[in-house]
Swiss-Prot record:
Its main location: cytoplasm. ATP binds at residues 29-32, 86-90, 413, 478-480, 494. Residues 524-543 are annotated as: Disordered. This is Chaperonin GroEL. It comes from the Bacteria.
Length: 543
């Protein structure tokens, strides 16, 4: 296919045009007084959002060369979202500012490769400054502040702080759509997996249709149970003690299942059977998780363990087990804290090593089940459109709080960028020529988030930037209430990881755009000539 090629200034200008179209669409959402963007959907109602990456993903431009610029900046947003989960609008805005200032200098004759060196030096200094200025998250209040700023709503901040407190930092917090108007939090303590009882005859509470076992033994095996003789020795031992039993096995059917149900109906003893969760190797790993959590062993022939010879000491124990039609919850397992901690560390290592998103998600689920439980935030709203918008904000806020716990918090509202300007400015003494120009470009770009937040609030950005520059470190502008305050004291904070990632990713892509000398794209194919109206198709008019 024939290609169209643009060179030099013309190529860079086309890319810049695309960058500006995408960035101008996204940056109106920044800050407490930022607006929303409406995205058209082929099916269903339009999506209204202020999430940078969601907007960026929808932008596709008609001009091939301009579209390349837009796609490059889209990468800034998606990469920042992948690393930090928030800060996508800031990253896009920074990329635009660096490209804009850089283009002016390249057009004036600056060497892009030397400029790039200056950009990188300045960013490394700025990132070091951001890390130095950050402070650790101290308790629930800080988490609530981060989430409130990210979601732009206090209720959401409080909900997320409650959820993080209940399930710890390693716990899983999921966001679901609620059937009601309100937004609320539901916490499942202990380990939950998606397998329920094998027979409705096993329930102990017929009103709720669930089986509740207090202080039961737990038999964990990867075998398929059909013969009751395999189970008899251990069952007799449990009946003697007057205890209840939960069996987790690959499957239970035939004589084994019938005998268990009959004994339950006769009142001899209470036993509930469920299938093992997961499939293949993941099933083995999950059974091992359950065994460690409950202080038992997985009875498997792979380890030379025979079901007939199972001892009572090989069974797990828990304070309570609740078995529903489709879920089983093990509360307060009897496993040793040391073993559980060691297992958690092992899963964390696997999460770091895996390259598959699916595997990472499944490993994080296992980690959550072992470490604290699962919290579900149920999002409710008057209309579906509002619910989707709210859900996106909550997901962003969740990612921001996790990032804050990881690397700490810095002053929000763009103040963290201005606070590192003095450090970056010191580089002007040790650099010269185009490298020095690269440092100056970053110095200008660091002001951009504050300018944009102010402009979105209908104020003059330059005045506010100068005022913050001459104020003490940590002092910033509260755009919601239009006053200068100590940002951290006032609860306006951003995660250091989000701030750092936004800057690093913006420079990475901006440097690529500035060092571009030619752009190649497919030539648009000429449209086929339209068939004149009124002509008969084929020989249709003849007899």
């Amino acid at each position: 296919m024939a290609k169209e090629i643009k060179f030099g200034e013309e190529a860079r200008r086309s890319l810049e045009k695309g960058v500006n179209q995408l960035a101008d669409t996204v940056k109106v959402t920044l800050g407490p007084k930022g607006r929303n963007v409406v995205l058209d959907k082929k099916f269903g109602s339009p999506l209204i959002t202020n999430d940078g990456v969601t907007i960026a993903k929808e932008v596709e431009l008609e001009d091939k060369f301009e579209n390349m610029g837009a796609q490059l900046v889209k990468e800034v947003a998606t990469k920042t979202n992948d690393v930090a989960g928030d800060g996508t609008t800031t990253a896009t805005l920074l990329a635009q500012a660096i490209i804009r200032e850089g283009m002016k200098n390249v057009a004036a004759g600056a060497n892009p490769m030397i400029l790039k060196k200056g950009l990188q030096k300045a960013v490394d200094t700025a990132v070091a400054g951001i890390k130095e200025n950050s402070r650790k998250v101290k308790g629930k209040e800080d988490i609530a502040r981060v989430a409130t700023i990210s979601a732009n709503e206090e209720l959401i901040g409080t909900l997320i702080a409650d959820a993080m407190e209940k399930v710890t930092n390693d716990g899983v917090i999921t966001v679901e759509e609620s059937k009601t108007m309100g937004t609320n939090l539901e916490v499942v303590e202990g380990m939950q997996f998606d397998r329920g009882y094998l027979s409705a005859y096993m329930v102990t509470d017929t009103d709720k249709m669930e089986a509740v076992l207090d202080d039961p033994y737990i038999l964990i095996t990867d075998k398929k149970l059909t013969n009751i003789q395999d189970l008899l020795p251990i069952l007799e031992e449990i009946v003697k003690q007057g205890k209840k039993l939960l069996i987790i096995a690959e499957d239970i059917e035939g004589e084994a299942l019938t005998t268990l149900i009959l004994n339950k109906l006769r009142g001899t003893f209470v036993c509930v059977a469920v299938k093992a969760p997961g499939f293949g190797d993941r099933r083995k790993a999950m059974l091992q998780d359950i065994a460690i959590l409950t202080g038992g062993e997985v009875i498997t022939e792979e380890l030379g363990l025979d079901l007939k010879e199972t001892q009572i000491t090989q069974l797990g124990k828990a304070r309570q087990v609740i078995v529903q039609k489709e879920n089983t919850i093990i509360v307060d397992g009897n496993g040793s804290a040391e073993d559980i901690k060691s297992r958690i560390n092992s899963i964390k290592t696997q999460i770091e090593d895996t390259t598959s998103d699916f595997d990472r998600e499944k490993l994080q689920e296992r980690l959550a089940k072992l470490s604290g439980g699962v919290a579900v935030i149920q999002v409710g709203a008057a209309t579906e459109t509002e619910m989707k918008e709210k859900k996106l904000r909550i997901e962003d806020a969740l990612a921001a709080t996790r990032a804050a716990v990881e690397e700490g918090i810095v002053a929000g509202g763009g103040t963290a960028f201005i606070n590192v300007i003095p450090e970056v400015a010191k580089l002007l003494e040790s650099t010269s020529g185009d490298e020095k120009t690269g440092v100056q470009i970053i110095l200008r770009a660091l002001e951009e988030p504050v300018r944009q937040i102010a402009e979105n609030a209908g104020l003059e950005g330059s005045v506010i930037v100068e005022k913050i520059k001459t104020s003490e470190k940590g002092m910033g502008f509260d755009a919601l209430n239009e006053k200068y305050i100590d940002m951290i004291e006032g609860g306006i904070v951003d995660p250091a990881k989000v701030t750092r990632s936004a800057l690093q990713n913006a420079v990475s892509v901006a440097a690529m755009v500035l060092t571009t000398e030619s752009v190649v794209a497919d030539k648009p194919e000429p449209e086929a000539p339209a068939v004149p109206a009124g002509m008969p198709g084929g020989m249709g008019g003849m007899y």
